[in-house]
């Protein structure tokens, strides 16, 4: 089993089901591994920005880790605009970036670039694979990093020889980090604010905007009179008949000031103060 095959089985073990790909020659062993598998769906895109945008959308809507397969630094660069969006949305996305073989890097081929440097601005977690033997564990840790709640961008840079050399057995899924619970003191403070008679805004995002989350915040709003507002750019918002009304914060400051002019206090739920 070569590195690409063991890596793919490791990704499948971690719950990855779909790969949005725009590969080149450096990724052919990864393409071959996907082609042999009936557990990984591969979707070919003709532009890397489509790969990253589709991966972001899939991760948001399905709540599952999405996979991209991109060719070298230029391919990553073409995908970066939508990876920026995915990072801001905290979508669970794993990028597999092929690179020149370790022994070929020194020749500075035409498409050679600083892939690590290009990865940083659009990733929460970056790793450059050292060998075929470490690749399966690197892949398992990439999935683990991507699934840190509410989601992260994990980028794995894979030199071609690490994909085609003989490797070790696939790695089982690693434990996922549990959602951090609000501290008791923060809950007590929120309850006190909601009951002090002042006009309150609940600023919402992420888990607070799921169907279950909206049911809870609606109960709070009805009991306390709090106004419900969500971030201007929300990763996902459950909508439809029977759900509570949530205002989206205006993009321009003038709009937001009108929405917030009566507010005396604000409680952030799964988000941060508006910028």
Regions found by a protein language model. Give the residues of each.
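N-terminal alpha/beta PP-like core and its mobile active-site loop of ThDP/TPP-dependent enzymes
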Residues: 1-275
């Amino acid at each position: 089993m070569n590195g690409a095959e063991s890596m793919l089985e490791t990704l499948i073990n971690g719950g990855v089901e779909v790969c949005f790909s725009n590969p080149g020659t450096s990724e052919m062993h990864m393409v071959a591994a996907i082609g042999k598998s009936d557990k990984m769906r591969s979707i070919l895109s003709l532009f890397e920005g489509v790969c990253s945008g589709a991966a972001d959308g899939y991760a948001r809507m399905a709540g599952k880790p999405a996979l991209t397969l991109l060719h070298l630094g230029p391919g990553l660069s073409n995908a970066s605009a939508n990876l920026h969006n995915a990072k801001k949305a905290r979508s669970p996305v794993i990028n597999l970036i092929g690179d020149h073989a370790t022994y070929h890097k020194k020749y500075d081929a035409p498409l050679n670039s600083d892939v690590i440097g290009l990865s940083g601005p659009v990733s929460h977690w970056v790793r450059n694979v050292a060998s075929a033997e470490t690749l399966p564990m690197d892949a398992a840790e990439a999935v683990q990093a991507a699934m840190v709640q509410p989601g992260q961008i994990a980028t794995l840079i894979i030199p071609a020889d690490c994909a085609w050399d003989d490797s070790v057995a696939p790695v089982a899924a690693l434990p996922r980090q549990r959602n951090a619970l609000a501290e008791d003191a923060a809950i007590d403070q929120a309850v006190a604010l909601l009951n002090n008679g002042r006009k309150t805004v609940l600023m919402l995002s992420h888990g607070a905007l799921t169907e279950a989350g909206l049911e809870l915040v609606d109960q709070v709003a009805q009991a306390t009179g709090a106004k419900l507002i969500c971030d201007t750019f929300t990763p996902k918002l459950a909508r439809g008949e029977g759900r509570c009304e949530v205002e989206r914060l205006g993009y321009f400051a003038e709009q937001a000031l009108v929405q917030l002019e009566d507010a005396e206090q604000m409680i952030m739920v799964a988000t941060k103060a508006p910028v």
